Design a protein with these regions (language model features):
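Structural signature of tandem-repeat unit edges
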Residues: 1-29, 39-52, 62-75, 85-98, ...
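Consensus positions within tandem repeat domains that build extended binding/scaffold surfaces
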Residues: 32-34, 54-57, 77-82, 100-103, ...
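Ankyrin-repeat interhelical turn/loop motif and analogous interhelical turns
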Residues: 378, 408-412
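Long, compositionally biased eukaryotic scaffolding/regulatory segments
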Residues: 416, 420, 427-448, 452-458
Length: 458
C-alpha cells in the first residue's frame, strides 16, 4: 500500500496517511511512533493477526476518531494513543492484560471505553485528561491502578472499584471534579492519601466492611479508626466531630472542605499531616495538647482555618494561630502574629483567650506606637487600645473622623467616652466656610507581618 513501510510483518511507518485507512492482512505489529506524522488520519481498521501496538504508535493523530482493534491484540505500548484528542470510543479486546503508562493520555473526546476482563494493571497517566469520560466499568481482574491513571477525567461522576483491586496510587483520580461518590472494595489494601485529591464534588466515601478502610457519615478512616484519611469536600455535613480514638489526621484530609463550619479534634490526636486543613471552611481548629507532630503547611493559605494552640513550639510551626497562653511566653518574632490571633479570637468570640487579656493589654501598651498607626482600620484593635488606655489625645481626631466616615456610631461613642474620661471635653468639629468638615484621617502604616491582616472577614 502506498506510503506504508512494512517489513517482517511490522508496519514501521505510515508516512502521512490521511482519511480512513485499513491496514493490510499480514501485519502483526505496529512499530513505535509509526503513525506519529498522520495528523489527518480519521479512521483506522487493524487486521486480525495483529498482536502488538508499539510505544507512541498513534501519537498525535489529532483527527483520529475511530479505531477498530482486532481480537488478537495482546499488547498496547506506552503512549500508544497519546494526544489522539478526537478519539470518541474504543473497545479493547479481551486478550490484553494491562493498559500501559500514558496509553490514552490526552484523549479528551473519549466518552465510551470498555475495559475487558483480564486487565490486571492500569498504568500511570493512562487516561490522563480524558475529560469527556462519564462512566467507567472496571473488571474484577484489576489489581492495581497506578499514579495519576485517571487524573483530570473531569466528567466522571461515579466510581465503584472492583473486588480484587489491591492498590490505588498517588493522585490516581486527581481533578475528577464531577465525581460524587466512591466505593472501596474489601480487597483494597493500599490507597494513597491523595488518590482523590481535587475531587471537589465528592460527597461521600463508602467502604466494604472487613477491609482496610471504614467510613462514618461518608468520611474515610482506617479500619481501626485511628487515622482520619479523607473528608469528602462536597459533604453535606457542616460539623465534623472526629471520633474518640483517632490519633492521626492524614495529609490533605480536610483539603477543600469549604462548606464545613466546625471541626472538633479529640485529645488523643498526635499527628497532623501536610495540608490537612488547607481550604477547609471552619473558622478555627483547636489543637489537642497530646499533639506530637504537626506538618509545617497543615494550615497553609489565607483561606484555611485558624489553629488554636497552647504550646509555643506548635505555634512556631504555624502561619496564623490563636495562642492560649501569655504573649510573653512566646519569642519576640512570634508576638505580632500572636497579637493578631488574639484580636481575631476576641472578634470571633473564642472564650478561652479572655484568661490572657492582661498579658495582651500589657503588650499593646508596650508597643503602643506600632499598633496606633493602623488602629483606624481595625475596630477590634482600636477597642483593645482604648481598654489598654494608650490612645493619646492627638490621635483622637483622626480616629473619630475614621469612625464617622465608616458610619460607625458605636465606635464614635466609644472614642468620645474615652476622651471625656481621660482628657475632659470632646474636641470641637472642624468648620470651614460655615460647613463642618471631618478631620483628616492619618494614613495607616503597614500592618505587622501577620497573615491575619488584609484577609478580610472569613
Amino acid at each position: 500500500m502506498t506510503g506504508l513501510q512494512i517489513s517482517d510483518g511490522v508496519l514501521r511507518s505510515a508516512g502521512d496517511a490521511a482519511g480512513a485507512l485499513c491496514v493490510p492482512e499480514g501485519v502483526t505489529a505496529i512499530g513505535d511512533r509509526a503513525f506519529s506524522a498522520c495528523t489527518d488520519l480519521t479512521e483506522l481498521t487493524l487486521p486480525e493477526g495483529l498482536t502488538e501496538l508499539g510505544e507512541g504508535a498513534f501519537f498525535n493523530c489529532i483527527r483520529l476518531r475511530r479505531v477498530t482493534l482486532p481480537a488478537t491484540l495482546r499488547r498496547i505500548g506506552a503512549g500508544a494513543f497519546r494526544w489522539c484528542g478526537a478519539l470518541e470510543a474504543l473497545r479493547l479486546p479481551a486478550g490484553l492484560t494491562e493498559i500501559a503508562d500514558e496509553s490514552f493520555f490526552g484523549c479528551a473526546a473519549l466518552t465510551e471505553l470498555s475495559i475487558p476482563a483480564g486487565i490486571s494493571r492500569i498504568g500511570s497517566w493512562a487516561f490522563y485528561g480524558c475529560s469527556a469520560l462519564r462512566t467507567l466499568a472496571l473488571p474484577a481482574t484489576l489489581r492495581r491502578i497506578e499514579d495519576s491513571a485517571f487524573r483530570g477525567c473531569a466528567s466522571l461522576e461515579e466510581l465503584t472499584l472492583p473486588e480484587g483491586l489491591e492498590a490505588v496510587g498517588s493522585r490516581a483520580f486527581f481533578g475528577c471534579e464531577s465525581l460524587k461518590s466512591v466505593s472501596l472494595p474489601r480487597s483494597l489494601r493500599e490507597l494513597d492519601p491523595d488518590a482523590f485529591f481535587g475531587c471537589t464534588a465528592l460527597k461521600e466515601y463508602r467502604a466494604e466492611a472487613g477491609g482496610a478502610f471504614s467510613t462514618v457519615d461518608g468520611v474515610l478512616y482506617s479500619a481501626d479508626m485511628r487515622t482520619l484519611l479523607a473528608f469528602p469536600p462536597a459533604s453535606m455535613l457542616r460539623r465534623c466531630a472526629v471520633p474518640e480514638g483517632v490519633e492521626e489526621i492524614a495529609p490533605a484530609a480536610f483539603f477543600g472542605a469549604g462548606e464545613l463550619r466546625e471541626i472538633t479534634l479529640p485529645e488523643r490526636v498526635k499527628r497532623i499531616g501536610a495540608a490537612a486543613f488547607v481550604g477547609a471552611g471552619a473558622a478555627s481548629v483547636r489543637l489537642p495538647r497530646a499533639l506530637e507532630m504537626l506538618a509545617d503547611d497543615a494550615f497553609a493559605g489565607r483561606q484555611s482555618p485558624v489553629a488554636i494552640c497552647a504550646d509555643p513550639e506548635t505555634a512556631a510551626r504555624l502561619e496564623k494561630f490563636v495562642y492560649l497562653g501569655a504573649i510573653d511566653d512566646l519569642p519576640e518574632r512570634l508576638r505580632p502574629a500572636a497579637a493578631a490571633g488574639y484580636l481575631w479570637a476576641v472578634e470571633h468570640g473564642i472564650p478561652d483567650v479572655s484568661r490572657f487579656r492582661a498579658s495582651y493589654l500589657a503588650h499593646f501598651r508596650a508597643e503602643r506606637e506600632r499598633y496606633l498607626s493602623f488602629a483606624a482600620e481595625d475596630e477590634t484593635l482600636l477597642l483593645q487600645l482604648l481598654e489598654a488606655e494608650v490612645v493619646p489625645t492627638e490621635a483622637l481626631e483622626g480616629l473619630l473622623a475614621a469612625a464617622a466616615r465608616r458610619e460607625r456610631p458605636d465606635l464614635t461613642a466609644a472614642l468620645l467616652d474615652y476622651q471625656r474620661r481621660h482628657f475632659g471635653a470632646a474636641p470641637a468639629p472642624l468648620e470651614l466656610g460655615g460647613e463642618t468638615e471631618e478631620a483628616p484621617i492619618p494614613a495607616p502604616a503597614p500592618p505587622p507581618d501577620s497573615p491575619f491582616y488584609g484577609t478580610g472577614d472569613r
